[in-house]
Amino acid sequence: MKFPVVFAILLAGGCLAPAQTNDLDLGDVFDAAQKWAQDNMDDDVLKTLQTVDRDQVVDFLNHFQNYLKGDFVVDLAQLHTAAQTVLPLLDAHPETQPYAAWLRARLDYFEAAETLQQLPPKPAPEKPLPPRQNPSFKIEQEIWIKKVAPRPWPKNAQEIVPELKRIFTSEQVPAQLVWLAEVESGFDARARSPAGAVGLFQLMPTTAKKFGLNLWPRDQRQQAEPAARAAAKYLRQLHAQFGDWRLAVAAYNSGAGTVQKLLQRYRTKSFARIAPHLPAETQLYVPKVEATIRHREGAELEQL
């Protein structure tokens, strides 16, 4: 398997912020990318990349992940073209189709970021510009409600959602939260993130093991029922910790430590207070989950 040189084009124009490209040292970038890969990517990804131009692919994934973990939602807009270009390349090879499934479930974030980027600017103030800010949570909610409204049920969802709901209910978690699987993976159990999250509910290895899943000889994260039970247990634990479903969903995406630190930093128990300070992906993830649950179930996340 060989990926075309399109990755070089993506790196030059699709993933790097303009301010970063002027004095870019490719040697430094590749060295940093290799170190990042060893620290952040699971063994299966590294094995897959052994037969491709690994420096370019890893550097692409490095910047991709960094933007998702970044501070500003609109920065994700510049990844849209790159993601659309690389998706069919990943889809074309069985070895990388799980990563295509993961990326496909996140194209929405880049589209939403483009929409937010195109909103009319506020009138220029007479005083110096204030610090850069993220769009309000309310604006993000409105965008996601419009985006998910026309969507049919994902493939396979009708077959497995009833059983997933039964499992969530048995774990004392609102059944409507099974729709996290649509946001996480598009109900594609093959989905795998570059960092090693796998399955319908994108569980990391440590989380999966903590909640009783086996990763070998068969990875139970790719089995709908065991994965749903582990995800439900994790969500129940997060809700017990934070007492709020928005905070619990944010923690599911970004980690409980991230949410806890922000709550402590801003001396609050409110999701609304910390929402603009969450990682960019999480800022888009929570309102997307809300809009998806509203569309599929007619329910409100904060009232579950």
Model-based region annotation:
Residues S170, E182-F187, L200-L213, S254-T258:
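Glycine-rich, acidic and aromatic/proline-enriched surface loops and short helix-turn segments
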Residues L235-Q264:
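Catalytic and binding regions of secreted/periplasmic enzymes and modules that target cell-wall glycans
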Residues Q172-R190, A231, A248-N253:
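Short, functionally critical alpha-helical segments immediately adjacent to catalytic or ligand/cofactor-binding
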Residues Q202-T207, N253-R265, V286-E302:
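A structural motif
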Residues A195-P217, A228-L235, K261, V286:
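Substrate-binding/active-site groove segments that recognize
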Residues M1-E182, R192, K269-S270, P276-H277, ...:
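Cell-wall glycan-active module
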Residues V178, F187-P194, L215, Q222, ...:
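Primarily short, surface-exposed interaction patches in extracytoplasmic proteins
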Residues P150-V161, S170-V173, S193-F201, Q220-A228, ...:
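Solvent-exposed, acidic/flexible segments
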